[in-house]
Amino acid sequence: MQRTPSKPPQSAGGEPIHQQSTTSITRVNSQISNLESPSRITFLEGPGELPMLEVSTPWSTAEIFLHGAHVTRFKKHGDAPLLFMSQCSRFQQGSPIRGGIPIIIPWFGFREGLGQHGIARTRAWELRDIRCSREGTVTVRFSLPQSQEASTFPPFQAEYSVSIGATLDLSLEVRNQSADQVLPLENCLHTYFEVSDSTMITITGLKGSKYLDQVEQFARKVDSEDSIRIGSEVDRLYLDTAATVEINDPQLGRVIRVEKSGSASTVVWNPWVEKSRRMPDFGDEEFQRMVCVESGNVADNTLQIAPLEKSVLQVRLVSSRLGA
């Protein structure tokens, strides 16, 4: 699913960057300036003094924070933003960013004594490499430093690449570094999509799939409807599905296609009224402008990664005109 440029890309490499400093920002910007590409890339200090990348390609713009390797913006020229960001989001060390694309590993949901949704979304990732094709596609590669926070799991290595062009391509690789232990792994790209009105969209591609309904204490159900519509809180873990999912937004005249590989689960979530009011980093009315369609492997689809083996989760997000 990853795009292969027709000409060899150029790279801005060097030592990994994992924390903001004047020296590191200056050095990376100096390396980037030497790349021959129609795209523009700037490394700078963002909100909360968190380091971030701003990317502009011939097709689109994007923003990525090192904190969580978190994509907070992707917008095709002439189109509405693809990703939703809460106006109440925190930008601070140790807190997740609300919106965009949080990375969830090695567990999904809440675990007693461990917290919510793993460690990756609240950690500073290392910036490993930036590559630009001569046509303008930009690929940024990150790695997650080892942490004692995940000491209840066998040691693992995580790498993440983001390719920005006419589409947004994501690849999350997790390798079990243990020589003798299996790594139980839940992974998820918890993507928040911007929509005109959550009650007006339809989500297709999951008819006939079984799911766990978290709103009803994980009741097991089968989706018999042609499409999902949002009219109350929705929190569903769809299982054993590799299907492409589409978000149809008639008011924006847009369809978003979520293509994936290495994923057997799709999560669909909208917090609706009451849960929105309980979340301190989410606006009371913001549920009207977003829906999460998340790709990964969760619950019954938890992966068992053999010693020294790896899993690769890939997602491509495609935005096009509705009916085109």
Task: Name each region found by the language model.
Residues 164-169, 178:
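Beta-rich strand-turn-strand
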Residues 58-116:
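Acidic-aromatic substrate-binding/catalytic surfaces of carbohydrate-active enzymes
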